[in-house]
């Protein structure tokens, strides 16, 4: 075996072992979130601009890289979350401004997600206790 091939194998083995060396236990703590706004039962209208706001408990971020938060929308009561409605957010963010889409539903639910690339797996925090309504667009 030539030196180049040996180096490639050693490099590949090192990369495959790296994620196991940094576990979520090393991250120190768990993630949770609670939606503040929109409130349970609140009626929103397509095109309306609102502030989505939450409180969260983050793990210790010391030594972690590539961390972000995202907020996803479900229009079927939280069974599926098919639409990311936020930009990639700093993990310490507590809100973002959102334009409500024209997706009428009586069962809108948000999922406030957190993760740190390979160091802390994407963690879901769906908010089914804070179901809200997206009304039909007014007819003009």
Where is each model-derived feature located?
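Bacterial N-terminal signal peptides
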Residues: 8-18
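Positively charged n-region of N-terminal signal peptides that target proteins for export
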Residues: 1-5
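Extended, solvent-exposed regions of the mature portions of secreted/cell-surface glycoproteins
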Residues: 21-140
């Amino acid at each position: 075996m030539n030196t180049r091939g040996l180096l490639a194998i050693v490099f590949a083995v090192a990369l495959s072992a790296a994620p196991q060396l940094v576990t979520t236990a090393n991250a120190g703590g768990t993630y949770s979130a609670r939606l503040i706004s929109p409130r349970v039962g609140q009626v929103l209208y397509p095109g309306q601009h609102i502030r989505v706001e939450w409180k969260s408990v983050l793990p210790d971020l010391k030594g972690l890289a590539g961390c972000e938060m995202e907020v996803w929308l479900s229009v079927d009561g939280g069974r599926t979350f098919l639409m990311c409605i936020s930009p990639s957010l700093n993990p310490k963010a507590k809100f973002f401004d959102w334009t409500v889409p024209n997706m009428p539903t009586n069962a809108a639910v948000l999922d406030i997600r957190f993760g740190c690339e390979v160091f802390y797996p994407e963690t879901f925090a769906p908010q089914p206790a804070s179901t809200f309504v997206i009304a039909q667009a007014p007819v003009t």
